[in-house]
Every structure is written in structure tokens, then in C-alpha cells.
């Protein structure tokens, strides 16, 4: 890993974004987030000869996801005439980067703004990059806000505004790779902490704002594009989808997406989990564990990660640790113990470090890997459970006023 703490603003993506990161022209269809078959159909509708559409779609796919271009003029093997046709009808622009924060530990957080859809306002979401020894993990958001109101999570205090589209989910990955110099012929910013060799973004986790399984189709589409071998080509073993326990979506995820699964568990008794993760009232632990045991492809080589935030005097007793072992019996699993990351207005305290270590020892002795996650990006509110944007849902009166103004 290239260790450098020279985090001067000169290295920020905000100062380098004017040429290739622009606000999408909302009147044009974006090619980002479309499947190759959908790109073929889109090309047919704008007069591209049918015999060329499949070849053109492959060219576009390469330029978008291998070369990482955000301007049709950069597509050197496409004629000027075709470039003009594409520019007239389609967009491949990036969202606006409203803000970028860099933690003292090298973690980066971007605040991205997406254009209004329908009668809504433009919305903002947060995306986080976490550099580690030999790898770089990108934490993606799936929704603007969240419906789940988990009591220890900052995002849960922001009501759901809307789901993100497949385009908007993928755009987070493209922006991060732009900013980190992770596409060919792109430079890594001065002072950035990134893996020395290979890709800067090696792993992605659907652990940002929102519940991915409440936006299943868009998340599925985005992850299948991200893992396509002719494009972004991320291994499905390096993609993790985290859910708070939307049981009906768990089996579908394994069958249709095939990525690694993480469960936001956080408690071993229904009474406690009802308080921490209210969706437990709908899908209690018995149903959740049954779904995990039946996750397609589950094996010692493809374990489920169970996330467990350590809350002082709430869920951190040694009896809780022993109950956790019983709960996971028969499930190939790893347990991530997460020291609670405070946020403005939170009502919980992090467990004492000695207690976290004792808890981990009990779980380890039962044969489960139970790493204690090192908090990353706490100083910029980028750590687990700290993400929140300022976007809010329009009140009904405001929405109607806007609809009338634009003639909908």
C-alpha cells in the first residue's frame, strides 16, 4: 500500500472534475446502467443500422466500462458522424461531485448530486472509499435515505426520498474510479492512499445509504454490469450485498446475482433486535437464519458475513456471544464486530475495547473468524452507520406545486 498522509486539497477530485465529471443532461437517455441488449435497442431507435447495432453496443460498453470515458469525443474508433448522433440523443456524463472529504486515515467520502427525476428535487448521496493493505473497498448507496429506522444508524434518521436507479448506483463506482485514477491513462491524485499495484477499487460493498433489497431490481442490474467480464469485470466474490434481513430477497440474491452476502445482525434476541433493527418484527431471527442456511452456493469458501455493532450494555455480554454461536450453528460464517461509530444525536455508546476483545475471544474459540473492524473515516462521518445526506422528500403540497409548474 502506498502510505502517504499528504492530503492537501490539490489531490482532491473536486479540483480535477471540470473536464470529465459533469451534471447529466436529464433530457437525454443515459447509456450508463443499460444492459448491452438495451443499448442495442436504444441505438436502433435513433437510426443506427441494425446490422451495426450489436458491434456499436460492444464498442460503447468497452469505452464506458473498460476505458472509463465520460465524453463521446474520446471514443476514438467511432466516426465523428456517429459521435454526433450519440451526443445528440444520449448522455454518459457523471453526476456532480458536491463535496469530497479525506480522512486522516486515507478514507475518502464523496457527496454526489443526481438530477431531479419527475417532480422531485435533485438528490444527494454519499459514497465512501476505504483503502487497505492490498485492496481498496468502495461502499455504495442504493437509496436516498432509508425506511428501516435502525436506531443505531445515522442514515435511519433520514426518511426515504427515493430509490437510486441502476445508472446512479454504477455512477458511484465510475466517479470513484475517475477520482482515484483507476481507469487507463488516468492519474491517481497526489497524496492518495491506494493499493500500490493493480486496481484502486478491488472490492465493492452495498453497505451505504439504504436497504439494497428494497431496491432489488436496480441493485441487481448494477451489480451484474459491474461484474460483467467484458467491462468493469469485478469478481462476484469481491462484491458484497448487505441486508438488514429482507428475507424474501435473500434467496433471490443468491440465485440471480450470485454475490457475497452480509447480514446486519446486531442482536441475538428478537426483543433486542426489534429495538435495534425494526424490520426484525416482520422477519424475526428464526426466518432470517433459515434464509441464510438456504443461501445458494453457501460453503466454507463462500461464507456469509454477519455484522454485529458493539453497543455498551445492550448486546455485548458474554452470554450474547454464546447465544450468537448457537444462532449461527451450521452456517459457514464470519462475524465482523463493529465498534459503534457515534453520530450527532445518537443515544448509544460503544462497548469498552476490553469487552469487545472478550466477546471476540468467545466467538473465535467456537471456530468462527471474528475480526474487530477498525473504524475508518470516523473524523469525516464516513464510518459504518454514519452516512446521511441533506436530501429530504418533497411535501405533498410542494410536489403538486412543482408538478403544476412543469405541466405534469
Swiss-Prot record:
Residues 132-373 form the Radical SAM core domain. Its EC number is 2.1.1.192. It holds the Pfam family RlmN_N. S-adenosyl-L-methionine binds at residues 210-211, 242, 264-266, 341. It catalyses: adenosine(2503) in 23S rRNA + 2 reduced [2Fe-2S]-[ferredoxin] + 2 S-adenosyl-L-methionine = 2-methyladenosine(2503) in 23S rRNA + 5'-deoxyadenosine + L-methionine + 2 oxidized [2Fe-2S]-[ferredoxin] + S-adenosyl-L-homocysteine; adenosine(37) in tRNA + 2 reduced [2Fe-2S]-[ferredoxin] + 2 S-adenosyl-L-methionine = 2-methyladenosine(37) in tRNA + 5'-deoxyadenosine + L-methionine + 2 oxidized [2Fe-2S]-[ferredoxin] + S-adenosyl-L-homocysteine. [4Fe-4S] cluster binds at residues 146, 150, 153. It is found in: Cytoplasm. GO terms for biological process: rRNA base methylation; tRNA methylation. SUPFAM superfamilies: Radical SAM enzymes. GO terms for molecular function: 4 iron, 4 sulfur cluster binding; metal ion binding; rRNA (adenine(2503)-C2-)-methyltransferase activity; rRNA binding; tRNA (adenine(37)-C2)-methyltransferase activity; tRNA binding. The keyword rRNA processing applies. Keywords: 4Fe-4S, Cytoplasm, Disulfide bond, Iron, Iron-sulfur, Metal-binding, Methyltransferase, rRNA processing, S-adenosyl-L-methionine, Transferase, tRNA processing. The active site is at residues 126, 384. Its cofactor is [4Fe-4S] cluster. Binds 1 [4Fe-4S] cluster. The cluster is coordinated with 3 cysteines and an exchangeable S-adenosyl-L-methionine. One of its GO terms (cellular component) is cytoplasm. Disulfide bonds join 139-384. Gene3D superfamilies: 1.10.150.530, Aldolase class I. It is an enzyme of class 2 (transferase). Belongs to the radical SAM superfamily. RlmN family. Specifically methylates position 2 of adenine 2503 in 23S rRNA and position 2 of adenine 37 in tRNAs. m2A2503 modification seems to play a crucial role in the proofreading step occurring at the peptidyl transferase center and thus would serve to optimize ribosomal fidelity. Reaction proceeds by a ping-pong mechanism involving intermediate methylation of a conserved cysteine residue. This is Dual-specificity RNA methyltransferase RlmN. It comes from Bartonella tribocorum (strain CIP 105476 / IBS 506).
Amino acid at each position: 500500500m502506498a502510505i502517504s498522509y499528504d492530503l492537501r486539497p490539490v489531490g482532491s477530485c473536486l479540483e480535477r472534475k471540470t473536464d470529465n465529471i459533469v451534471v447529466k443532461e436529464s433530457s437525454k437517455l443515459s447509456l450508463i446502467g443499460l444492459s448491452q441488449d438495451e443499448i442495442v435497442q436504444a441505438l436502433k431507435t435513433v437510426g443506427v443500422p441494425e446490422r451495426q447495432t450489436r458491434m456499436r453496443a460492444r464498442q460503447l460498453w468497452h469505452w464506458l466500462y473498460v476505458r472509463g470515458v465520460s465524453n463521446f469525443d474520446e471514443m476514438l474508433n467511432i466516426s465523428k458522424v456517429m459521435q454526433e448522433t450519440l451526443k445528440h440523443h444520449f448522455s454518459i456524463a457523471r453526476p456532480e461531485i458536491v463535496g469530497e472529504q479525506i480522512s486522516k486515515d486515507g478514507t475518502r467520502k464523496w457527496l454526489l448530486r443526481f438530477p431531479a427525476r419527475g417532480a422531485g428535487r435533485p438528490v444527494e448521496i454519499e459514497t465512501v472509499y476505504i483503502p487497505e493493505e492490498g485492496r481498496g473497498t468502495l461502499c455504495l448507496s442504493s437509496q436516498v435515505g432509508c425506511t428501516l429506522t435502525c436506531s443505531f444508524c445515522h442514515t435511519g434518521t433520514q426518511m426515504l426520498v427515493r430509490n437510486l436507479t441502476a445508472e446512479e448506483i454504477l455512477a458511484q463506482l465510475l466517479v470513484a474510479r475517475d477520482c482515484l485514477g483507476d481507469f487507463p491513462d488516468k492519474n491517481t491524485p497526489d497524496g492518495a492512499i491506494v493499493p500500490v499495484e493493480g486496481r484502486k477499487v478491488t472490492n465493492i460493498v452495498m453497505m451505504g445509504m439504504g436497504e439494497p433489497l428494497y431496491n432489488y431490481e436496480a441493485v441487481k442490474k448494477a451489480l451484474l454490469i459491474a461484474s460483467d467480464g467484458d467491462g468493469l469485470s469485478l469478481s462476484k466474490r469481491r462484491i458484497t450485498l448487505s441486508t438488514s434481513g429482507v428475507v424474501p430477497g435473500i434467496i433471490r440474491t443468491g440465485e440471480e446475482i450470485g454475490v457475497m452476502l452480509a447480514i446486519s445482525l446486531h442482536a441475538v434476541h428478537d426483543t433486542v433486535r426489534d429495538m435495534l433493527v425494526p424490520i426484525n418484527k416482520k422477519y424475526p431471527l428464526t426466518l432470517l437464519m433459515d434464509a441464510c442456511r438456504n443461501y445458494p452456493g453457501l460453503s466454507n469458501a463462500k461464507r456469509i458475513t454477519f455484522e454485529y455493532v458493539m453497543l455498551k450494555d445492550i448486546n455485548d455480554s458474554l452470554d450474547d456471544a454464546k447465544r450468537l454461536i448457537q444462532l449461527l450453528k451450521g452456517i459457514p460464517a464470519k462475524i465482523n464486530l463493529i465498534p459503534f461509530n457515534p453520530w450527532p444525536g445518537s443515544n448509544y455508546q460503544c462497548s469498552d475495547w476490553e469487552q469487545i476483545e472478550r466477546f471476540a475471544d468467545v466467538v473465535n474459540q467456537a471456530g468462527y473468524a471474528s475480526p474487530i473492524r477498525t473504524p475508518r473515516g470516523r473524523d469525516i462521518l464516513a464510518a459504518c452507520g454514519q452516512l446521511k445526506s441533506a436530501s429530504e422528500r418533497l411535501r405533498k403540497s410542494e410536489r403538486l406545486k412543482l408538478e403544476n409548474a412543469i405541466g405534469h
